[in-house]
């Protein structure tokens, strides 16, 4: 990705799971990277510790118009907009936070933020919701089933509208479920891994619902690949493997790979309301451009389990910064 060398890039959500991996990759490619973080939050972020001296930190609250206006005199080649409230289940309890973090932040950035040449909007597969046609195609009408999905879709639409009005170069990306090192334990894969490593009882639904899970390096590869290939598109682009797995099989794989003695109680829990039974990416477009995942699901899962084995005692420490991921 030599095209990124010396490019001035702003990453929102750069202290988050996907964002921090993106920032590290951009630094590796010798881009001039700035990261927006909430006030006084960077000191508590273990994800960026190793590259603090190689990035520029901008403290701002993207939900606050006046705060964003303070960046108006800055100029960047790209904004990678990843900042979001991104917990699907909890989004039902925190609707206003979803609106503020997922929608208002986008509106503020596009209307009051830095001068930019290109805006890369990081969406989500949750925009699709329940669909009749599998795998999910960007041509199908979105049907989000959570406040998270609704607000991320609205954010995408606002970005498209702004692009049409101002001729701003835009990419709207829809990555499917992602996993890897440094992910919050609120996500299903690290949650199950940590329970397996402690040999705790694991209670799940029947696990018939299917999801595809993409190793983080593959998603970052896809994001940067498509940004390099396509200057502008108001049509969203899926990033995913097109290889779904039933949740019950996922749990059993983690249990096996971690050599856990945890008791599995599959079928113990009820399905959540508005359960999405199948999520699978139609990835024909990005594959047709020459991208494909480099790391298989099973290898990525083993790498991730090994990482959590190294750090799980840190996760268990109530005072650990990892608890804030």
Stretch-by-stretch model annotation:
Residues 28, 196-325:
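C-terminal substrate-binding subdomain of Rossmann-fold SDR/epimerase-dehydratase oxidoreductases
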